[in-house]
Amino acid sequence: MNLNASMFGQAISFVIFVWLCMKYVWPPLVKLLDERRAEIAQGLEQTEKAAQELELAKANGEALLTEARSKAQAIINQGKQRQEQMVAEAVDLANQEKARIVAEGKAEVESERSKVRQELKDEMADLVIESASKLINRNLDSSANRDLVNRFINEM
């Protein structure tokens, strides 16, 4: 029965082959598989970490964007407020200038009125004296007549 001896030899060869594989081939394969498993786990961990960082960056970006928008709105509001203040100041200044010009105009009108009144009084006095002189056909004392006419005009 060569078949048994051959089978026995094959079994011993198989056991030796398995032992050699376990001793020299299997440990490097297990090591490679463990390293690959560790790399995959590390890659998954890094992917999760990157996803978390991305979410955090999005949240920070949204917060920064919201803050920037609020600051921009505050600057716009401040600009509008300053504009309103400047317009109010310009209106006040224009009103003051208008009041000054009106006051100067009134003063000038009053001055002109007084001047014209005085000129009219003087001219009226001259005309009255001249008329009176022609009526009585003689030349009266002009200073006495002028005083008399001025007193008469002032009583009016």
From Swiss-Prot:
Subcellular location: Cell inner membrane
Sequence similarity: Belongs to the ATPase B chain family.
A GO molecular-function descriptor: proton-transporting ATPase activity, rotational mechanism
Main location: membrane
Cellular-component GO terms for this entry: plasma membrane; proton-transporting ATP synthase complex
Membrane topology: Single-pass membrane protein
Organism taxonomic ancestry: Bacteria, Pseudomonadati, Pseudomonadota, Gammaproteobacteria, Vibrionales
Species of provenance: Vibrio campbellii (strain ATCC BAA-1116)
Keyword presence, NAD: no
Protein name per its UniProtKB record: ATP synthase subunit b 2
Function: F(1)F(0) ATP synthase produces ATP from ADP in the presence of a proton or sodium gradient. F-type ATPases consist of two structural domains, F(1) containing the extramembraneous catalytic core and F(0) containing the membrane proton channel, linked together by a central stalk and a peripheral stalk. During catalysis, ATP synthesis in the catalytic domain of F(1) is coupled via a rotary mechanism of the central stalk subunits to proton translocation.
Sorted UniProt keywords: ATP synthesis, Cell inner membrane, Cell membrane, CF(0), Hydrogen ion transport, Ion transport, Membrane, Transmembrane, Transmembrane helix, Transport
